[in-house]
Every structure is written in C-alpha cells, then in structure tokens.
C-alpha cells in the first residue's frame, strides 16, 4: 500500500533540497513549484512543512482563478478517535481560513499534500511497521514532526 511505498521512498533521495508528497489524483496549478517555494519561505522556519487536505474533486474549481473560494484555505481542526482508539482527522477538512498572507501553524498533517525540506524524510521517516494502520499514518507522523522541530 501507499504507506510502505512512502517509507521506502526516502531511500532513493539524492541531494534534493525539497521533497513533496501528493496523492495520485492531485492536479497541479500553473507554476505550482514556485508557488510552493514562495509559501514555504513565508513560514520563516527551516523545519516548516506545508500540508493540507486538498479540495475534493466536486469543489476543486471553486478554489481556482475566478472561483468563489479563491481566497479560502481548507483547515483541518478536529481530531476524532476511532472505535479502535486510533486518532484520525475528520474529512473533509472541518474548518477554513480566508485571505491568508502567510501559512498558519497547523493542527495536523495530511499525507495528501506535504511540502518541506528533505531533511524531514530523515528526521521523521515513515514508520514502515504501521503499514496496516491507515488512519494512524497522518496523526503519528504529525506528532513526531511536532516533537522533532
């Protein structure tokens, strides 16, 4: 599954400065690479990670140029606990922010979109022993990111 593949991906990293992780169904905007770099610089944090749950396909056009939600950013705020005790994020994102001038410190991390310096992959690697714990992936990695800088 994706968690095992993600845990192995860091083994093929060369000397890349930035790493990005996206879901397979992700669409990219024009100049996405420069936009991501510019937003990351606004974090003013060497260990900053840009991450968010992308808009679902039905509302994706609302967030593009000319869309009614162009200045909105979905924001993951709440964590719920599943019957098995695993923490999981409510989907779709349960909050939003409007007219940001720079990224906000988040309450979580999304495996659907993540952009950071590649040292993240070394200091907070995927736990390849949690390959069957899909809901646990995001929260456990977020907690380890938080405690490691």
Give a label for each model feature.
Residues 1-149:
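Catalytic cores of eukaryotic secretory-pathway lumenal/extracellular enzymes that build
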